[in-house]
Design a protein with these regions (language model features):
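Conserved catalytic breakage-reunion loop centered on the nucleophilic residue
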Residues: 1-197
Length: 197
């Protein structure tokens, strides 16, 4: 700041770039703040891991085919309104149909895609996917079908830690392979059996 003739004042921390003695302590204060952030991060991750290992669903929105239990928002119940769609997707896959063919079959039935259904159930943040075209609400993507077929949640298992977090500062979180995911079995009723999955 000083070399650009900018004065920085932080009243709460007692920092004033014109005061040399206050500036001498600033690097140490930054180190302490960094340590505090790291400590809080570790504690939050630990609390989330403990809840996950107890079989608690931690997502904000239930996966397609499920609703959150009104008595326990960390438990999933089958959503009878759309569970038949999930079953049909698995039945078609078990009959040897590929993802593209399954997608075409579902699209012909004019079924709300998962994001549109979530919005109808009160979820927010998904509108951008189809706000420009009402018909988009009924167009399933191959990724939606693939996601359902690959998710252990549909067999009653909770899957988590699907990404690698390098450190608390990094926004990059590459995906792990499905066999590297942490899975807690039998946390809720499955829409399909373990064998079908």
């Amino acid at each position: 700041f000083p070399e650009h003739n900018v004065r920085y004042i932080a009243v709460n921390d007692g920092v004033d770039t014109l005061n040399k003695s206050a500036m001498d302590i600033t690097p140490f204060r930054n180190i302490l703040n960094e340590m505090y952030s790291a400590d809080v991060s570790v504690k939050i991750k630990s609390a989330y891991r403990a809840r996950f290992q107890q079989g608690k669903f931690m997502g904000t929105t239930a996966p397609y085919g499920y609703v959150k239990d009104p008595a326990d928002h960390n438990h999933l119940l089958i959503d009878d309104k759309v569970a038949h769609v999930v079953r049909e997707i698995f039945d078609l896959a078990l009959a040897g149909n590929g993802i593209a063919k399954i997608r075409k079959h579902i699209n012909k039935q004019h079924i709300l895609r998962p994001a549109a259904y979530a919005v109808e159930q009160g979820a927010t943040g998904y509108e951008r996917y189809f706000e420009d075209n009402e018909e988009n609400r009924y167009i399933w993507s191959e990724n939606s079908v693939r996601g359902i077929l690959r998710s252990p949640i549909y067999a009653g298992n909770l899957a988590g830690y699907k990404r690698i977090a390098a450190n608390m500062k990094s926004k990059k979180r590459p995906s792990k392979l499905p066999e590297e995911w942490e899975v807690i079995p039998d946390t809720h009723e499955g829409i399909v059996t373990q064998e079908e999955f």
